[in-house]
Structure formats: structure tokens, C-alpha cells
């Protein structure tokens, strides 16, 4: 810096766009995972509270669109709660695998600069390091895993939404949707 001046501070000493991009990406996704976990924990608490309010509310569970057995609404909602907990578990497991520092991987084969990767991991809030430098720059599977976890979680919510919609039909008449959440036909009654 003394010889070159302030421009020297812009040198990519010991780092590459490859490891920088993966580092920033992992920091972004760990935030998304934490936000998702927080939302799921709150949703699960609300579902459990609603289940507790309905331990004696009898309903029919259907299989293949046929009445099968009597259960309680509380029992049904606890199934939703269990599905939410499995999603929380998946996100927490992903967080552990994903929150590893790739910085210092360089372009792919590391760097000759004496970087303290453990220190950068600690400073950036990572729990550890991606040990293999090629994986540190080429490993992007955490994005696909996050998308997969989202799809699994949202399919569970989709099941709930679909069943509530079905229960609100004239054939079932088990639930009533607030008009703000229901659509109507412009032609049919």
C-alpha cells in the first residue's frame, strides 16, 4: 500500500470472485433459512394453540373422498403441526451444512496467501469452514436444497388449503370461508 497507494486496497489478495460469490450467497441463504424457521415456529405455535382449542371438536376424516373415521379437529391440526416440525427440522439441518465458510478457496484450489480461514469464519458468523476448496467454489447444492425444503413445506400447506377449500364446498359443508378468501363464479350462483 505504501508503494502503490490506495489502489492496492482494491487488490483481490487471497480471494477470488468464485469464493466471494459463494460466501455472500451462503450468508444470504442462512438469513433466508433463519427467517423461514422463525415464521414456521410461529405458524406451528398458532396451529398447536388452535388444536388445543379443538380437542373436543369432532369431525370426519376422509380417505379417497369417502368418509372414513371420526377424529377431532385438534387431532387433524396436530398432523399439520407435525408436518411443520419436520420442515423446521429440515431447515435446521440445512443450516448446519450450509453455514460453512468457503472464503479462502480462491478460484478453486485455495490461495498461497496466509489467510486465517477460521478467523474469517468467526468474523462472518459461520460455524465452520468448507474444507475442500473446489467444493468451496463449486458447491451450490445448498440453493437446491433450500428450494427443495420450500417445496416440501409448501406442499404441506397446500394440502391444508386444498382440504379447507374442499370442506367449504356445498357437498361437504364442514367449513365456511370468509368471502375475502373465497372466489365466486361470474356466471354461476
Predicted segments — roles?
Residues 1-110, 115-122, 184, 188:
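A helix-coil-helix interface module used to build multimeric assemblies
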Residues 124-189:
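Acidic, glycine-rich loop-and-beta core segments that form the ion-binding/anion-interacting portion
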Amino acid at each position: 500500500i505504501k508503494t502503490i497507494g490506495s489502489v492496492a486496497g482494491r487488490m483481490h489478495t487471497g480471494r477470488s470472485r468464485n469464493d466471494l460469490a459463494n460466501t455472500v450467497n451462503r450468508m444470504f441463504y442462512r438469513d433466508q433459512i433463519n427467517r423461514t424457521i422463525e415464521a414456521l415456529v410461529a405458524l406451528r405455535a398458532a396451529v398447536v394453540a388452535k388444536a388445543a382449542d379443538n380437542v373436543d371438536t369432532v369431525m370426519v376424516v376422509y380417505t379417497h373422498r369417502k368418509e372414513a373415521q371420526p377424529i377431532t379437529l385438534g387431532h387433524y391440526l396436530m398432523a399439520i403441526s407435525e408436518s411443520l416440525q419436520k420442515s423446521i427440522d429440515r431447515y435446521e439441518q440445512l443450516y448446519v451444512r450450509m453455514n460453512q465458510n468457503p472464503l479462502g478457496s480462491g478460484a478453486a484450489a485455495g490461495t498461497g496467501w496466509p489467510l486465517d480461514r477460521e478467523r474469517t469464519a468467526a468474523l462472518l458468523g459461520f460455524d465452520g469452514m468448507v474444507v475442500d476448496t473446489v467444493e468451496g467454489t463449486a458447491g451450490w447444492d445448498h440453493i437446491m436444497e433450500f428450494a427443495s425444503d420450500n417445496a416440501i413445506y409448501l406442499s404441506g400447506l397446500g394440502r391444508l388449503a386444498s382440504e379447507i377449500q374442499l370442506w367449504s364446498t356445498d357437498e361437504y359443508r364442514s367449513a365456511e370461508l370468509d368471502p375475502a378468501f373465497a372466489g365466486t363464479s361470474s356466471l354461476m350462483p
